[in-house]
Amino acid sequence: SLGSWTRPQLMSNHNYPKWEIELSANEFNQPVNYKYVIVKLDNHNIATWEEGENRLLMPFVPPVEDSIFIVNDEKFRYPVGNFKGAGVAVPVFSLRTNESFGVGEFNDIRKLVDWCTLTGLKMIQVLPINETVATHSWLDSYPYKSITVMALHPMYLHLPGLGALKDAALMEEFEKARLELNARPHVDYVGVNRNKARYFKLIFDQNWPEVSKLESYQQFFEANKEWLKPYAAFCYLRDRFKTSDFRQWEEYATYNPELIDQLTDPSQDFHEHIAVHYYQQYYLDKQLREVVEYAHSKGVAMKGDIPIGISPNSIEAWTEPHLFNLDGQAGAPPDDFAVMGQNW
């Protein structure tokens, strides 16, 4: 019943990076040899065996009834040894190309992947790419002060991936803005996001009836609605009350799942202001997945940086305040980089 070297017992990663499994002590009335394996996701067939001698587990004799015996093993022994390689760390917003809209986008990572392939680099680390919009100003440009640990920043969407507007005059207007923003020596954060937000609304109004019926969209929504609905509600309330400080949101100041369900109900006459965030996150997920798959196909790993903590005016602080010490702050002392110090 333990597998007999042919049928692996699947372990849980619910406590990642630890992998765990519970087994009956009745199975261990004699010494047991075992190894760890990596299995394929689709059929659970063994893809890789760990190297080295078999691991050995001696019989467990419980001192009292209902005893628990815990075994902590060493790490998986990869047959090719531990990975070692060089990489590059870069903010996505700095990867502007001729195809960009004034800022580096997920689509632009492809060219960095190609460069890594040419130079022998094996890993790309990007600065945080989560949504940071709290004030709709340049203050939101700091990538480490996100309003969510789940949603991605709409700024990184490659607009052609959403489709073209049917209005040719509008497309010409956006192309002119794109060229102007792309020609500037620095990222015009406010200008980029103002223009992109306008495009998002126009393309959403045009294509949402069809996109909302796509099976791929419906699967995305069902798989992510636990965080997607609170995120969309947060963005709507942020704009409605003109602040990301949820403590000023009157009856919504204290998170209530029932109120959020009412707020995100498709029958609401303002539902388009909710659904546009679903729409953006669907395409962000799609475009990022495509570029990560492209990187993997070239033998380049993708790695993301994350902030040290959450913003006090964030979705997680609103929905799960019991998980955080919201009276605490973190930062760094003064140095040559920031002579006044930093308050993160």
Regions found by a protein language model. Name each.
Residues 55-78:
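Extracellular beta-sheet/turn segments enriched in Thr/Pro/Gly and aliphatic residues
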Residues 45-50, 65-71, 245:
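Short, well-ordered strand-loop elements centered on a beta-strand within folded domains, enriched
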Residues 2-3, 13, 28, 49, ...:
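A generic structural signal for short, solvent-exposed coil/turn residues
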Residues 77-321:
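Acidic/aromatic-lined carbohydrate-recognition and catalytic surfaces
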Residues 35-37, 125:
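Short, conserved beta-strand segments within well-ordered enzyme catalytic domains
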Residues 316-344:
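Active-site-adjacent "gating/activation" loops or surface patches in catalytic cores
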Residues 1-30, 37-62, 101, 139-144:
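Aromatic-rich carbohydrate-binding modules that target alpha-glucans
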